[in-house]
């Protein structure tokens, strides 16, 4: 688990050296390519290709090296819009998704803080720390000298890469084209694919061993790219040798069977009907804007409408029996469930004990013994205030529940909803005055 200095208003933000080192690599690589041609000679096409290949390789290498932790950073602004009521060292604390940074490198508009702690929340949003990123890829450069916040990184907003994707794809295409001129198309294609595959594999291995975003991961990616590119180039050379000696006969005509493409998930309107979806979405959006406008912005129309629809009698009485295998789980109900689950995943976790009142079949109640593990195939509704009616009273301690009363049809229920198949350990069981009292603790 990462432990990093807490971020506050006016703490500095900085960009890496990726852009500057990429430009330096482009220039340096082009010079090296030109020098090689000057020494060895070559046609005009070969000379141009050598310069392009050198520039592409140098630019890509410079971009990666510039992002290393030891590469210099340059300060581009400060953090702003901290918490109105939580202070660290006398300065407002910074929260992901709400707080911003004033970055001189990315125009006059403020950039939202896009990462924070997955364990520590301030005003219901992840607490930001040093090294967390803003939406423009600037990182928080300075922080509190004595307040440390733990937890892995949680991303709340999209992050634009420091080097746009089109630039990297252009470098890749230019390098592959230059390789085709300098060598052969087969060597260029297989070498490029080998480099991409090796780099991807190296990134996965390095991320697992050294951590995501670490220098070790980046070195592993570079090494994998070089090894994969070399192996692919050798494979291309062998292919060229085989092609030049093989007698090629016209292939027989064959009929290729094309598997149908799986259709995308239904919209909420397709799943429950256009009018029903419209009513749910409009009502939920109005409730959310009134009760918690910030959370409202996290959800799409299909997600907010589906969560609201679940809270109605028509919603949960249709979904839960199907999820528990008691009624058919139709494609429409699968889509409905997917939109509810996607929406819950975007909401902050509820911290605290919740309660549930219910009536369980005898064979299910019998499974609820101390030390046992239980789960519900459907969504599990609990309340942050008082349990619902029933001869079984359950107290729940977990961290996967999401409070949805800000959009619910029944706000007074203070509903906290757990996703299907959440696993709990039965910590205690007491029989008292005809009521069974159970204590659940979520299993991570």
From Swiss-Prot:
The UniProt similarity line reads:
Belongs to the Arg-specific ADP-ribosyltransferase family.
Q: Which CDD domains match?
A: PAAR_RHS
Q: What is its main location?
A: secreted
Q: Which reaction does it catalyse?
A: L-arginyl-[protein] + NAD(+) = N(omega)-(ADP-D-ribosyl)-L-arginyl-[protein] + nicotinamide + H(+)
Instruction: Provide the alphabetized UniProt keywords.
Output: Glycosyltransferase, Host cytoplasm, Nucleotidyltransferase, Secreted, Toxin, Transferase, Virulence
Outline the subunit composition.
Answer: Forms a stable complex with cognate immunity protein Tri1-Sp.
**Which stretches does the entry tag as region PAAR domain?**
72-140
EC number, as in UniProt: 2.4.2.31
User: Which Pfam families would you find in this protein's record?
Assistant: ART, PAAR_motif
Output the superkingdom of the source species.
Bacteria
Written domain comment of the UniProt record: The ART domain is toxic when expressed as a protein fragment.
The TR mART core domain sits at: 266-444
Q: What is the name of the protein in this document?
A: NAD(+)--protein-arginine ADP-ribosyltransferase Tre1
Q: Which InterPro entries match?
A: ADP-ribosyltransferase_ARG, ART, PAAR_motif
Query: Can you say where in the cell this protein is located?
Result: Secreted; Host cytoplasm
Tell me the active site.
356, 381, 415
Residue ranges for the region (ART domain) are 274-444
Q: What does this protein do?
A: Toxic component of a contact-dependent interbacterial competition system (also called effector-immunity systems). Acts by ADP-ribosylating a number of target proteins in target cells; E.coli target proteins include FtsZ, EFTu, RNase E, Fis, RL9, SucB, and LolD. FtsZ is thought to be the physiologically relevant target as it is ADP-ribosylated on a critical residue. ADP-ribosylation of FtsZ prevents formation of the FtsZ mid-cell ring and inhibits cell division. Overexpression of the whole Tre1 protein or the ART domain in E.coli is toxic; cells elongate dramatically and some undergo lysis.
Q: GO terms for molecular function, please?
A: NAD+ poly-ADP-ribosyltransferase activity; NAD+-protein-arginine ADP-ribosyltransferase activity; nucleotidyltransferase activity; toxin activity
> Which GO CC terms are listed, alphabetically?
extracellular region; host cell cytoplasm
What does the UniProt entry report for the null mutant? A double tre1-tri1 deletion is outcompeted by wild-type cells, but not by wild-type cells missing a type 6 secretion system (T6SS).
């Amino acid at each position: 688990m990462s432990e990093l200095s807490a971020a506050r208003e006016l703490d500095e933000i900085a960009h890496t050296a990726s852009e500057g080192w990429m430009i330096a690599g482009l220039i340096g690589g082009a010079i090296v390519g030109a020098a090689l041609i000057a020494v060895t000679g070559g046609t005009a096409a070969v000379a141009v290709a050598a310069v392009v290949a050198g520039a592409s390789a140098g630019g890509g290498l410079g971009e990666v090296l510039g992002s290393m932790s030891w590469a210099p950073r340059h300060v581009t602004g400060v953090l702003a819009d901290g918490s109105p009521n939580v202070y660290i060292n006398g300065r407002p604390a910074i929260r992901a998704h709400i707080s911003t940074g004033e970055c001189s490198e990315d125009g006059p508009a403020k950039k939202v803080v896009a990462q924070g702690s997955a364990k520590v929340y301030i005003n219901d949003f992840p607490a930001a720390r040093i090294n967390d990123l803003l939406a423009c890829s600037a990182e928080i450069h300075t922080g509190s000298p004595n307040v440390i916040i733990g937890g892995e990184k949680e991303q709340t907003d999209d992050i634009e890469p420091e080097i746009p994707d089109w630039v990297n794809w252009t470098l890749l295409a230019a390098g592959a084209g230059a390789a085709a001129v300098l060598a052969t198309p087969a060597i260029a294609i297989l070498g490029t694919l080998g480099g991409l595959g090796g780099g991807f594999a190296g990134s996965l291995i390095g991320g697992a061993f050294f951590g995501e975003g670490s220098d070790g991961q980046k070195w592993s990616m570079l090494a994998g790219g070089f090894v994969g590119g070399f192996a692919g180039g050798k494979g291309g050379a062998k292919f060229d040798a085989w092609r030049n000696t093989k007698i090629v006969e016209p292939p027989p005509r064959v009929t290729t069977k094309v598997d149908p493409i799986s259709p995308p998930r239904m919209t909420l309107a397709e799943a429950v009907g256009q009018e029903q979806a419209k009513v749910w979405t409009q009502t939920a959006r109005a409730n959310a804007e009134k009760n918690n406008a910030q959370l409202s912005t996290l959800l799409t129309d299909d997600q907010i409408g589906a969560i609201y629809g679940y809270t109605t009698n028509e919603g949960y009485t249709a979904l839960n029996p199907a999820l528990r295998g008691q009624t058919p789980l139709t494609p429409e109900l699968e889509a409905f469930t997917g939109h509810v689950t996607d929406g819950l995943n975007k909401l902050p976790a509820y911290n605290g004990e919740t309660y549930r009142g219910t009536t369980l079949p005898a064979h299910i109640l019998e499974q609820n013994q101390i030390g046992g593990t239980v789960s519900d195939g459907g969504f599990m509704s609990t309340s942050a205030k008082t349990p619902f009616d029933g001869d079984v009273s359950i107290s729940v301690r977990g961290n996967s529940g999401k409070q949805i009363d800000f959009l619910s049809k029944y706000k007074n229920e203070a509903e906290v909803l757990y996703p299907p198949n959440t696993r709990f350990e039965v910590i205690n069981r007491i029989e008292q005055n005809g009521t069974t009292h159970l204590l659940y603790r979520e299993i991570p």
